[in-house]
């Protein structure tokens, strides 16, 4: 995405190995998730397949909802949108779900205010830390003095860290992440998890609306040859908001294997 404050224009550069297109719109906003929108690409079979099978269109529709909730955007409301973890209609789809605006995986995000020549860069973790503001005019004006270490951000426009970082939800998400990695390691190394029953109970409580919580519990039981329990958790995973159709297909295939 590129923008010009002096021209009041924003556009998307869409690119594949064989062609490049510039997408613009006459609307007051230009939205983008992870699929092409230009005439050159929108009817491409790969793009159509991506829209049908990925989380991109779902996120786009959620973005439209959030813009309706925030009709007059400023840098703070944009940060709020980028940090949103809900699904469509505000549904709780679990923490870290790919269908959310904030999937709790991003290294950073950037907010630009071209007309005022300002930009904000998020700090760790996952767009939840402070957004630090920089002013292009002051940076370039003071450039000759940058021969010593000094802070060059505009602290007056810092966006505070998300209060989610102080919540029980954040603590549970950290538990969920570490527990999921422990399950993966147990499956890969074929080593048991100590106090497995208590461990699984804690894992399920840590992120109960996220489909992967149940999928990975099922995978752990499948690795232990406990197909009956694995099937129960695969079915539970299917009741949640799953990232894309390929994951749904995979889980349904695993359920069939459990019944062999």
Give the residues covered by each predicted segment:
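Structured, non-membrane catalytic/scaffold regions adjacent to prosthetic-group chemistry
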Residues: 1-27
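C-terminus-biased signal that marks the final domain/tail of proteins
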Residues: 5-10, 30-232, 236-260
